[in-house]
Curated annotation (Swiss-Prot):
Family: Belongs to the polerovirus movement protein family.
Residues covered by region (Disordered): 55-80, 106-156
Posttranslational mods: Expressed as a nonphosphorylated 20kDa form and a phosphorylated 22kDa form. Phosphorylated by a host PKC-related kinase. Serine phosphorylation is required for plamodesma targeting.
Locations listed in the record: Host cell junction, Host plasmodesma; Host chloroplast envelope; Host Golgi apparatus; Host mitochondrion outer membrane
Domain notes: The N-terminus is involved in homodimerization. The C-terminus binds ssRNA. The C-terminus is phosphorylated.
Chain's role: Together with movement protein P3a, facilitates long-distance movement of virions in host. Transports viral genome to neighboring plant cells directly through plasmosdesmata, without any budding. The movement protein allows efficient cell to cell propagation, by bypassing the host cell wall barrier. Binds ssRNA.
One of the GO BP terms on file: transport of virus in host, cell to cell
Region annotated RNA-binding, chain positions: 57-156
UniProt-recorded name of the protein: Movement protein P17
Signal peptide: none
Region of interest called Homodimerization, as start-end residue ranges on this chain: 38-54
Bias kind Basic residues: ranges: 144-156
Source organism of the structure: Potato leafroll virus (strain Potato/Canada/Rowhani/1979) (PLrV)
Length: 156
């Protein structure tokens, strides 16, 4: 079982789902994973944060990600691997500059009989608005649409 919840927002005001998603994310993150009484439970937690600054635009981009995985032994009838794995992750990205602010967050939960490969974490570089750094594509070069370069005509 796995579940992913996404929320993209330009400011939280006017977004009726922003508060609900924040509450859900907090509930999901605080929820005890695994079998609390299991003596052989193993837990792994990862916290990552990255930031980018664009001085020419007075812009900043931030990405933070928290992930927790818990596993514990279980009978072979329940899980062929003999363990159950549960993972919860919360990812939040922000991009802001004087004229705009964009926030995006996602929560992820999975429970499996075998360790799952980690879900892809959005890259901050691919998420930030970088279109202005790439030249626009050239206009069509077909012979019918090609325009001749302007010529200077001298009159005597």
């Amino acid at each position: 079982m796995s579940m992913v919840v996404y929320n993209n927002q330009e400011g939280e005001e006017g977004n009726p789902f922003a508060g609900a998603l924040t509450e859900f994310s907090q509930w999901l993150w605080s929820r005890p994973l695994g079998n609390p009484g299991a003596e052989d439970a193993e837990e792994e937690a990862i916290a990552a944060q990255e930031e980018l600054e664009f001085p020419e635009d007075e812009a900043q981009a931030r990405h933070s990600c928290l992930q927790r995985t818990t596993s514990w032994a279980t009978p072979k009838e329940v899980s062929p691997s003999g363990r159950v794995y549960q993972t919860v992750r919360h990812s939040r990205m922000e991009y802001s500059r004087p004229t705009m602010s964009i926030r995006s967050q996602a929560s992820y939960f999975s429970s499996s009989a075998r360790p799952l490969p980690p879900p892809p974490v959005p890259s901050l570089m691919s998420w930030t608005p970088i279109a202005k750094y790439h030249p626009s594509s050239p206009t069509s070069t077909s012979s019918k649409l090609r325009r001749a370069a302007p010529k200077l005509i001298k009159r005597g």
